[in-house]
Regions:
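Intrinsically disordered, low-complexity, polar/charged repeat-rich segments
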Residues: 1-192
């Protein structure tokens, strides 16, 4: 809560715990022409790809230890562009593929033996993500509309699922007797 200003105390609230990860988005690119390495099996209907290269910043960390089930990202920009990007991510992505080395094939959910393709999801619509408290007798849609008009930026978060692959497990360095882990990976969001 804030100190009172003209007798009014403001309450501040977050809907989710913040996880700070030792990661950096090193590069993000969008391509209409797909140039996947040999051995990559793309889903049928792919027309473009959004590639996000992530760097692991901590020498002690491993990908398996820092990557959550989903990587929550905030879409920042001009409102109409954010809207189009959110639509593309949450409605047009066919799969999230991982590339551990620059010239190696992209690994899809099929090649990893996962039961279904991974797709980004919208954040901010669940009851446990509410910013405003409403009477339980009120319809959830009323809360969502109120929050959308009062806090539209709250809905600019997207969870990008990260496939768990064996190549991301490894030792932090060669000194501990293991194989050195790759310090960068690329997530390829293939779009229809």
């Amino acid at each position: 809560s804030s100190r009172p200003i003209k007798g009014v105390t403001c309450k501040f609230k977050t809907t989710q715990a913040v996880s700070l990860l030792p990661l950096r988005v090193a590069q993000a690119t969008y391509r209409n022409a797909i140039a996947a390495p040999d051995g990559t099996r793309l889903p049928q209907g792919v027309t473009s790809v959004l590639s996000v290269k992530l760097d692991l910043l901590s020498p002690q960390a491993t990908w398996a230890s820092v990557l959550p089930q989903a990587l929550r990202v905030y879409l920042d920009g001009e409102a109409s562009q954010v809207s189009v990007l959110r639509e593309a991510l949450c409605r047009k992505v066919l799969d999230v593929m991982v590339q551990t080395h620059e010239h190696r094939p992209w690994q899809s959910t099929d090649s990893l033996g996962l039961p279904q393709r991974l797709k980004p999801t919208l954040v901010g619509f669940e009851d446990d993500q509410a910013l405003l408290e409403f009477d339980p007798r009120s319809h959830a849609a009323y809360r969502l509309l109120t929050e959308y008009f009062a806090f539209a930026d709250k809905f600019n978060f997207v969870d990008i699922p990260v496939p768990k692959i064996a190549a991301l497990r490894g030792r932090a360095s060669e000194d501990d007797g293991g194989t050195p882990i790759q310090r960068s990976i690329t997530l390829h969001l293939v779009i229809a």
